[in-house]
UniProtKB/Swiss-Prot annotation:
This is NADH-quinone oxidoreductase subunit I. PROSITE patterns: 4FE4S_FER_1, 4FE4S_FER_2. Belongs to the complex I 23 kDa subunit family. GO terms for biological process: aerobic respiration.
Length: 162
């Protein structure tokens, strides 16, 4: 480019006009964002959100205390203690997840033979203290009860790919 052309473009503010033309081009197009708290995008059935412990339809918890999720967790965020029951089966007495350590990899969900521990659809959970991110068995079961319908639908939608 010649010096005269560069000088002419600088005097006419050519770049400024190009920027405004680009702005006007997108100004009249439909918006590309959503109004988040009021509108939400659909989540994938494979979305990994807040953890939950599921129950059987009769109300009994699914976890059989095999501790596979604890063993497979790369962040060592899961702690399980169990005791044998009168009928010879094991059940958990303590099931804790330290959400500050969790990396949401989904290995715990994949390792569970009875689909007891799952990562649900909830991604909107915040706390004021770190202690609230230490989930115990009661909190995990409450999450499972709260999100059971959505969790079951997600697992059913994902079943052909498992």
């Amino acid at each position: 480019m010649t010096t005269a052309t560069q000088l002419l473009k600088s005097f006419t503010l050519w770049e400024f006009l190009k920027a405004h033309a680009l702005t006007l081009k997108y100004f009249f197009k439909p918006k590309a964002t959503i109004n988040y708290p009021f509108e939400k995008n659909p989540l994938s059935p494979r979305f990994r959100g807040e953890h939950a412990l599921r129950r059987y339809p009769n109300g009994e918890e699914r976890c059989i205390a095999c501790k596979l999720c604890e063993a497979v967790c790369p962040a060592q965020a899961i702690t399980i203690e169990s005791e044998p029951r009168d009928d010879g089966s094991r059940r958990t007495t303590r099931y804790d997840i330290d959400m500050t350590k969790c990396i949401y990899c989904g290995f715990c969900q994949e390792a569970c033979p009875v689909d007891a521990i799952v990562e649900g659809p909830n991604f909107e959970y915040s706390t004021e203290t770190r202690e609230e991110l230490l989930y115990d068995k009661a909190k995990l079961l409450a999450n499972g009860d709260k999100w059971e319908r959505a969790i079951a639908a997600n697992l059913e939608a994902d079943a052909p790919y498992r």
